[in-house]
């Protein structure tokens, strides 16, 4: 677990232990060499140094291990948000502008409209609109039930988790057969992204 905000020691130019680039967590910075230098060269492959706790392996494992970190709170990766095309926007079938409003905490998004007739799934709400609805929910004579609203990357994570990829792909294939022009191109683009997720087993 990363417990310190430090990155690299400015004197030794080595990653700080328990910091953001820690060799004990992510692997050695140099091929076949532990942090303290007790083990060097390929013949010590697979050994975990008893002094510094770093596994003697190739430094390229750092790239892989840094891609699988558990964060205290969800974050939206800028490549998938702002890249062209925006994969998050395509997957959620929402305009990029709306997705950005949620990520940057400018708008709330409806995760479940419950029994509220004025709300719909994925609808964006301003802070004032949400406060108004919240007042209605908590009033004594309220009939509103099951209304769920979110904001930030946590809300996006919930929306993405709600997607059944196989079912969505099947629906898109059916829609593509009857769609024409720009709408058809948009559906194909979305299907391609979903198929890639299914093929790689990504969730």
Curated annotation (Swiss-Prot):
Q: Which InterPro entries match?
A: DNA-dir_RpoC_beta_prime (IPR045867), RNA_pol_Rpb1_1 (IPR007080), RNA_pol_Rpb1_clamp_domain (IPR044893)
The EC category is transferase
- What is catalyzed by this enzyme? RNA(n) + a ribonucleoside 5'-triphosphate = RNA(n+1) + diphosphate
Gene3D superfamilies assigned to the protein according to its UniProt record, in alphabetical order: RNA polymerase II, clamp domain
GO molecular function list:
DNA binding; DNA-directed RNA polymerase activity; metal ion binding
- Please indicate if the UniProt record lists Cytoplasm as a keyword: no
The record's Gene Ontology cellular component field reads:
DNA-directed RNA polymerase complex
Query: What does the record give as cofactor?
Result: Zn(2+)
The UniProt function text for this chain reads:
DNA-dependent RNA polymerase catalyzes the transcription of DNA into RNA using the four ribonucleoside triphosphates as substrates.
Please identify the protein, giving its name as recorded. DNA-directed RNA polymerase subunit gamma
Protein source organism? Fischerella muscicola
Q: Which gene encodes it?
A: rpoC1
